[in-house]
Regions:
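ATP-dependent adenylation/nucleotidyltransferase module used to activate substrates
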Residues: 1-112
Length: 112
């Protein structure tokens, strides 16, 4: 078996594409989180960009009964619609939002 096939098989063990398997793994994880609740304000952190995937993840966390903290990394490249999506989703889902705004000059120097 070639290296690519071995890598694929290994990845499929950890990240299966079968919805039944994924659903069971998700259920186990959510159950574990809910059962380990202490007196914390949040159950999990969901990174939000304003795109479909992160907004849907936030929605699913709430649907599963979790109390997520939405975290957004503002690097200065946000679109107006992404910002509006984040505002709408966090308001509608009643989720707290923490936005970290980078120092643009420092961030720019890291990209060189």
């Amino acid at each position: 078996m070639c290296n690519f096939c071995k890598s694929h098989d290994l990845l499929m063990e950890f990240y299966p594409r079968d919805e039944k398997v994924l659903g069971k793994k998700r259920d186990v994880l959510v159950h574990k989180i809910l059962n380990s609740r202490k007196k914390r304000q949040y159950d999990c952190i969901v990174g939000v960009s304003g795109g479909t995937d992160s907004i849907y993840t936030l929605y699913m966390a709430k649907k599963e009964g979790l109390n997520p903290l939405a975290v957004h990394f503002d690097n200065g490249w946000n679109t107006d619609i992404a910002v509006k999506n984040i505002e709408n989703a966090t308001t509608k889902l009643d989720v707290d939002l923490y936005t970290y705004v980078v120092n643009w000059e420092e961030f720019k120097s890291l990209q060189k």
